[in-house]
């Protein structure tokens, strides 16, 4: 049993994910909350020293209320996945997708370089001002 677990410890996902994810549509029934589904907006290979190290996948989740903003998100998929993931950001009023590349805040640890899937979103509103709460005027945006 230990042999099987050690073989699964690192999983290569970049090659398979790249072709599967391009232009993917996400049906609403796959998402926990009520939405109009979502879609992948870009899949970009990021490389370091001539080799692919991860995929940067961005997308949106469409609201039910046409006046509510979409939820923007980004996921970094490592070339060699350690079967772990970490979410970055999501505090306060949010309003922007945080930087997922590089070291974490107040640390020199870079999750993507250690095989973590790294993800973040804008909580369903887009604002350059993290203290803005204008989104709260829309009930669906407030719930997001």
Question: Where is each model-derived feature located?
Answer:
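Cap/lid segment of the alpha/beta-hydrolase catalytic domain
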Residues: 92-144
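Hydrophobic beta-strand anchors of alpha/beta hydrolase catalytic cores
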Residues: 84-88, 118
């Amino acid at each position: 049993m230990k042999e099987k677990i050690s073989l699964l410890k690192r999983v290569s996902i970049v090659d398979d994910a790249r072709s599967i994810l391009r232009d993917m549509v996400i049906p609403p029934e796959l998402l926990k909350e009520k939405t109009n589904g979502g879609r992948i907006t870009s899949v970009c290979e990021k490389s370091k020293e001539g080799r692919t190290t991860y995929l940067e996948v961005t997308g949106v989740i469409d609201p039910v209320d046409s006046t509510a903003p979409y939820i923007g998100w980004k996921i970094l998929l490592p070339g060699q996945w350690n079967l772990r993931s970490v979410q970055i950001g999501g505090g306060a009023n949010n309003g922007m997708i945080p930087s997922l590349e590089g070291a974490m805040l107040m640390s020199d640890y870079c999750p993507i370089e250690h095989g973590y899937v790294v993800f973040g979103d804008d909580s369903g509103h887009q604002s350059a001002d993290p203290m803005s709460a204008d989104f709260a005027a829309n009930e669906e945006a407030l719930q997001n």
